[in-house]
Every structure is written in structure tokens, then in C-alpha cells.
């Protein structure tokens, strides 16, 4: 099984830092991927791919969620998402640089 992740994000500044993140997980497999996600998830929706086929094919799982960072000026904001895809862990770190002038 091969896994690739494509991440796009947009930032909205409020009294907290709200980051809307969309992850497309490309899974090359011969069975329907079982994905679990935990850590830093505010809201999440799943769009499921097709059912399993006898030969390996591309299944795209699109996951959209919001990360909420508290405003901190003395350090970087780090949030980690752990995806478990058919028993394989895909760990993604989001780092928001809070440097000030």
C-alpha cells in the first residue's frame, strides 16, 4: 500500500488563529482504506471513495477540518494530526510561525 498526502490551507485571523486545512490522502490499495484521525481536530468531514476492487487502484480520501491555535507570541504553534490508514500511521505536523517584529 502506498500513501501520499496533499495539503492545502487558508488562514483566518481572529483572536485565535483558525486554520482551515484540506487534506487529500491518495491511497493505492486493493481494499477500502480505514482511516482514523485524532489530535487537534475541531470539525471533520469524510468523503468516502469507491468500494474495494480485486486489483490495486487509487482511492482518494478528502478530509477537511479546522485547527484552532491560541495566539502565542513567544513560541511557534505546533499541532499534530495522526491518521491511521489500514494500520499505517501518517503523522502530519502543522507549524505556525509566530515571529514578531
From Swiss-Prot:
This is Putative protein p25. It comes from the Viruses. The gene is 25. It comes from Acyrthosiphon pisum secondary endosymbiont phage 1.
Amino acid at each position: 500500500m502506498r500513501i501520499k498526502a496533499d495539503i492545502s490551507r487558508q488562514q483566518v485571523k481572529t483572536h485565535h488563529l483558525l486554520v482551515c486545512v484540506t487534506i487529500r490522502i491518495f491511497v493505492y490499495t486493493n481494499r477500502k482504506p480505514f482511516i482514523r484521525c485524532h489530535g487537534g481536530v475541531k470539525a471533520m468531514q469524510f468523503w468516502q471513495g469507491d468500494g474495494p476492487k480485486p486489483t490495486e487502484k487509487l482511492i482518494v480520501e478528502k478530509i477537511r477540518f479546522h485547527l484552532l491555535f491560541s495566539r502565542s507570541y513567544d513560541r511557534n504553534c505546533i499541532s499534530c494530526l495522526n491518521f491511521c490508514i489500514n494500520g499505517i500511521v501518517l503523522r502530519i505536523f502543522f507549524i505556525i510561525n509566530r515571529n514578531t517584529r
